[in-house]
Amino acid sequence: MSLLQKTGPATLRAEKVLWRGGRVLSPTSPAATALIAEGDRIVWVGLDDEAPAADQTVDLDGALVTPAFVDSHVHLLGAGASLIGLHLADLPSAAAVLARVASFAASVPADGIVLAGGWDETAWADPTPPAAEEVERAAGGRLVYLSRTCGHTGVAGPRLLAEHPELAALDGFDASGVLTRAAHRAARAVLQTAVPVAQRLITARAALAHAASLGIAAVAEMAIPNAADPLTEAEFQGLIALGAEPDLPAVYGWWGELAAAEKARDLGAHGCGGDLSADGSLGARTAFVREPYRDADTLGAQYLTADDVAAHLLDCHRIGLPAAFHAIGDGAVQSVLDGLDLVEPALGIDAIRHARHRIEHAELLDSALIARMVHHGVHASVQPAFDAAWGGADGMYAARLGRERALAANPLSKLAGVGVPLAFGSDAPVTALDPWGGVRAALLHRNPVSRLPAAAAFSAATRGGWRALGRDDAGALAPSQRANFTVWDLTTGALPDLSDPRTPDPKCSMTVAGGRLVYSRA
């Protein structure tokens, strides 16, 4: 009988389980064919014929077992909506976007809302976004907001603007309906209030179940609170609670509010910040850069000063939480590092390094900025799929920044080479939940100089995620490590060669998170 015939989610209930007859990717036992998990820990790794007694045995049928993935940057509601709701990615034109919106809106009650994202004009022959009036017409007159794929700009229907005149007073408002900055975030939040928390959690559950099917044992949820949506706190607590359910990956929540560490702690957050934005995105031309954009006379948007960053860091250290900042442009990264410099005399470098603060995205960096990240012990939570989607000499980054700066973006090898710890994520729904895709993108970075070797890329997608969460007892298949592992449809004893575009991604057979079977293909 095969592994999947003999084992299913209902049968993995013993406290001490022997997984045998496979190829176990272990740093302590390179020839290992078996492991034992007891509760949420791995207690033994070795050869089949040397295995101690266990309460239950699972035959791996020669399958490869590796550490499970961690997605270090997700938005579960958006990720779930991209799976079971209206999603506008991979469409060839504004007309196609409007057609999909119209088709979806036909099933929505007349007093309902249409809230979606994912459109990307840089992939269209005519890069003109749909007009506000067109969007509202496609939505059948309903309140509507369509976010761009980056999540930093979007198009609001005229009715939304008319019924919420307070949006006009916010930074980033434009009467055309194309909103950025604070106006964009508020418009999205205003519509989100119409969605009950229970419905939001159904959507998030779909994302977590899908993550488990991809070999992901844990995710870092990046909450973006907004005063326009009073349900955000209940939603956030519900997302963390989902991660404690026995059939889902773990959820580590980041509360993205400035200098709100006490609130974050009380809500159950792992850290304060995350998608606490020091800038915006390159696609929206709101990433804060030190030299102007190539295609617009702007440096982007600076949302946080060094003083803001310093105040946030001091607040986090007072409560005992790590901090994280969204910073894409080199100007934003500099602001974060300047803030770290400001607090170093008061906190001491050892305390700063011990906290494992993070920069999310960290796309535009020079050697001096990287050296300062090393000094402060900052972890880089990066998305290799961004380079695959928009990098290179002729991609969207080149259009925004010019060829030279585009090719210098996402310098993964430089970061890893000098000791900046890397953690891979997707930023789903900005790019899809796809951990092997992220590993492949790191191996095939559009600038060969920035590519990572396979072992380093896989480590960043697994152990690196745990290290960035302050968990040194997870991410490796060795005794005393947490039992987070995945069984793949491979019978080789090594990782696949994803640098060859012809090599298919491995398929997940089982995912174990904290000793719990959260996915089985049976």
Task: Please tell me what each predicted stretch does.
Residues 258-262, 360-369:
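Short, conserved secondary-structure transition motifs
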Residues 36, 276, 511:
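Short aromatic-centered micro-motifs
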Residues 243-244, 264-266, 373-375:
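Acidic (Asp/Glu)-rich catalytic clusters
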Residues 3, 11-20, 25-247, 253, ...:
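Divalent metal-binding segments
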Residues 202, 314-324, 331-357, 362, ...:
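His/Asp/Glu-enriched, well-ordered alpha-helical/loop segment
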Residues 75, 270-286, 378-388:
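Non-cysteine beta-strand/loop elements that form the S-adenosyl-L-methionine
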Residues 157, 215, 280, 326, ...:
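Conserved, mostly hydrophobic/aromatic
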Residues 492-499:
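Short, Lys/Arg- and Gly-enriched loop/turn segments at beta-strand edges
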